[in-house]
Amino acid sequence: MNPQKKRRQDSEKQQLILQRNSQLHGVLLAALLAVVLLVFGLVNLLHTKRDFSENENRKLQAYPALTPASVLDGSFMSKLQSAFADQFFARDHWISAKLRIDQLIGQKESNGVYLCQDNYLIEIPEAPDPAVLDRTLTAMKEFAAKHDDLRMTAMIVPNASLVMRDYLPANAPAHNQQEDLFTVNQALSPCMQYADVTLALKAHVRDGVFYRTDHHWTSLGAYCAFDASAELLGIETPITNYRVHVLTNSFEGTLASKSGKHTAEDTITAYEPLGTDVSYYVLYDSTQEKAGSVFVDFALDTKDKYTVFFGGNHPLVTIKTTANNGKILLIFKDSYANSFVPFLIPYYQQIVMIDPRYYYDDVEQLMTQRGVTDVLFLYNLSTFSADTALADTLGAAS
């Protein structure tokens, strides 16, 4: 046989063998991938489903029921995708693993949270919807005009992204909340007092006015705001001496859950005023439950330990005190108020707290029944800018 022809045949045989091996490898890889996907699918379907994520502090999406209506309106596929993501096997471990990889390659952000110096986690602020913000401010101005005989104050608290701007990663893009605060101040100042606590918080940043792992201010931050606004609130001689109690050293907040970074724990403290004989009790109006303290101890055994203040948010809470001075304070609030209100207790005969997100009754009627003399709007800026419930509540009262 011609040697050249033989070499060509040998070459063709080798190519055929390589081609068959390549096809076999492809089949094996495809089979292996199918087995892996099948195993993961079965594990995801068979492992114990969770209703709530302790780490993320939120309710998880359950697998939806398949109905013709849910298929037609698209809700079935939407909920199914959310359920696959929420119920994924070992989800918390995958989130933590992703964060570690991101940090190794220099990422300074995780799921909308900046990973900042000194182990601080700071939520990335969003620019407000001008229409939503304008609607809220208009409702507040109309409410103030209707009740111009009352002492009315707005305290819109800047978030850590503004107060602790120096802690953000270098060149990190972040919406400047200072412009939003200016807009709010300009809108409200003609019709009510405006308590700007930005400088008071900035002055004590290194003392810890925000939690490292949570979006709330600390009890110290709340005290700094109280001290800066007391005169504006009509408190002539505010208490300056407190005994500070440590409630827990193991608080991991919502930003640790959201980012997946669990490398720090926060301390929650309570400030006990000294030199006052004013006593009080708390009434949770929706349940008619009474309590002798604003602090709910069992909350310290839960994931969301910040709910030690009043047990979290409620539609309506009343604090009745022995300060027989006729001052009745109505507060429209979010959760920032929960750690602020304890500082107000010695100075009012009654404090009425409304969380508009959960309150649906007639505010006007409530104000008349309680004989309200003072009103305070207390929100953090991020919540306030996106909130629609306050305008609805005030609109119902107008």
Residue ranges and their predicted role:
Residues 1-398:
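Extracellular glycan-modifying ectodomains
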